[in-house]
Structure formats: structure tokens, C-alpha cells
Amino acid sequence: HLLQFNKMIKFETRKNAVPFYAFYGCYCGWGGQGRPKDATDRCCFVHDCCYGKLAKCNTKWDIYRYSLKSGYITCGKGTWCEEQICECDRVAAECLRRSLSTYKNGYMFYPDSRCRGPSETC
């Protein structure tokens, strides 16, 4: 669920998804095209690819079980879809944390019109 993903992002990065990631680069937020702009944007690209493999799941709204303890995100038991969505979100949130040192404020509200060219394949 998007709100759960936001909590994971906040836990890992200490930043709220909105405004820091919702419109970042070419892939953070809805959709995406072109080449990822940097490591943070690549985290979002990989997250989009992860969700893309779950076409039969309601990736944005399915509620899953997870815990935030001792500095770690742990996905809990649930349906196959819930567990897979949680893993996509967990991996992305951890990726965003690893990319904090190269986060660029200039990509925070990056216009889609500047995301041109062919998209990479997943």
C-alpha cells in the first residue's frame, strides 16, 4: 500500500515520500520513461520493474504485514501478492537509503518533459 511504502521510506531515509520522492527524477512517482537520472531515480526504476512483475496484484492499494524494528524492515506473512509487494517496497526503501549521499534537490520536481529517449528494459 502506498501509505505503507511511505512509512518504509521515512524509516529508512528520514524523509517523507512527498515531497522528497514523489516527483523525483524520471521514475519516482507515477510512471516513468527515459534513463534514470541518478542512483535514487534508479531505485524507483527498479521498484517500477518489481511492480511490473506483479501485474495480477493491486500493487498500490493492497495492504500487507510488515514490521520496523532494530533498524530493519521485515515483511510478514500474507497472500502471495501481499508478500511480493512488501518485498518490492522494502528493497526500494533500502535502496533509497543507500542513495542518500547522491540525492540531488534539482531532481526533486523534475519535469516529465525532460525524460526523453528510450526506456531501459527491466
From Swiss-Prot:
Where in or outside the cell?
Secreted
The positions annotated as site (Putative interfacial binding surface (IBS)) read 2-3, 7, 10, 17-18, 22-23, 60, 103
EC? Answer: 3.1.1.4
**Keywords of this protein's UniProt record, alphabetized?**
Blood coagulation cascade inhibiting toxin, Calcium, Disulfide bond, Hemostasis impairing toxin, Hydrolase, Ion channel impairing toxin, Metal-binding, Pharmaceutical, Secreted, Toxin
Report the record's disulfide bonds: 26-115, 28-44, 43-95, 49-122, 50-88, 57-81, 75-86
Give a yes or no for keyword Hydrolase in this entry. Answer: yes
Query: What GO cellular component entries does it have?
Result: extracellular region
Q: Where is this site: Binds D-105 of CBa2, important for stability (T-31)?
A: 30
Q: Where is this site: Binds E-93 of CBa2?
A: 31
Question: What is noted besides the main data?
Answer: The crotoxin heterodimer is inhibited by the crotoxin inhibitor from Crotalus serum (CICS). CICS neutralizes the lethal potency of crotoxin and inhibits its PLA2 activity. CICS only binds tightly to the CB subunit and induces the dissociation of the heterodimer. Tested on the CA2-CBd heterodimer.
Q: What name does this protein carry?
A: Phospholipase A2 crotoxin basic subunit CBb
Species whose genome carries this gene? Crotalus durissus terrificus
